[in-house]
Amino acid sequence: MSEGESKSTHFGYKTVEADKKAELVAGVFHSVAAKYDIMNDVMSFGIHRFWKRYTIEVSGARPGMKVLDLAGGTGDLTAKFSHLVGDKGEVVLADINDSMLKVGRTKLRDKGIVNNVSYVQANAEALPFPDNHFDIITIAFGLRNVTDKDAALRSMNRVLKPGGKLLVLEFSKPQHEIMRKVYDLYSFKVLPKMGELITKDADSYEYLAESIRMHPDQDTLKQMMVDAGFEQVDYTNMTDGIVALHRGYKF
């Protein structure tokens, strides 16, 4: 790349300048933040709760641990982690989008979850935390929105303690052809109409469908985690691979 030539990346199926993607993604989540939880239930038929519950089970969170819920949005995982780590533990709900953080903070405070949770507006590519700080890091349905995923994974590795675990819960690639066809039909024909009906914003849900297709598949993401310094990396497909949970350790 010649000097002065800007880097490009994808925003859904569109090619955009890399330094513009974060702003475009922010616009999506500013738009949908208020109805984000409702849409999660509707568009996944509630199955996202199972995916997240499995993530919590795999995490091995225990009293006294420090947990980073990155791209934590409205705080579903944070709420569960708060109970598991107890008064001597700490959960940081971090998100780059202040609208999502506000919704998450309000929701958790309404549930009485206040003592061991803090909120940080942070870019996953340059996390504002000390080295070797967290026992567990989760990023659920957030990595595909990050401009430089490799930089984000390296940043997560840096702030994770030796012996710590990273869990990446993300949309991925269905494993069977019939599921791929049904999923494509649902994603591109039904999902935007749901978005228009519930949030008055079909475009954001068109972006969602496109961003999922542009996200690395299961094995590619596994290798990206290895390249970022994680060890014993593996993944579990859920709902035929519509979603995958990747796990890796720092030693």
From Swiss-Prot:
The keyword Ubl conjugation does not apply. Its EC number is 2.1.1.163, 2.1.1.201. It catalyses: a 2-demethylmenaquinol + S-adenosyl-L-methionine = a menaquinol + S-adenosyl-L-homocysteine + H(+); a 2-methoxy-6-(all-trans-polyprenyl)benzene-1,4-diol + S-adenosyl-L-methionine = a 5-methoxy-2-methyl-3-(all-trans-polyprenyl)benzene-1,4-diol + S-adenosyl-L-homocysteine + H(+). CDD domains: AdoMet_MTases. One of its GO terms (molecular function) is 2-methoxy-6-polyprenyl-1,4-benzoquinol methyltransferase activity. Disulfide bonds: none annotated. Gene3D superfamilies: Vaccinia Virus protein VP39. Pathway: Quinol/quinone metabolism; menaquinone biosynthesis; menaquinol from 1,4-dihydroxy-2-naphthoate: step 2/2; Cofactor biosynthesis; ubiquinone biosynthesis. Methyltransferase required for the conversion of demethylmenaquinol (DMKH2) to menaquinol (MKH2) and the conversion of 2-polyprenyl-6-methoxy-1,4-benzoquinol (DDMQH2) to 2-polyprenyl-3-methyl-6-methoxy-1,4-benzoquinol (DMQH2). Belongs to the class I-like SAM-binding methyltransferase superfamily. MenG/UbiE family. NCBIfam families: MenG_MenH_UbiE, PRK00216.1-1, PRK00216.1-3, PRK00216.1-5. This is Ubiquinone/menaquinone biosynthesis C-methyltransferase UbiE. The gene is ubiE.
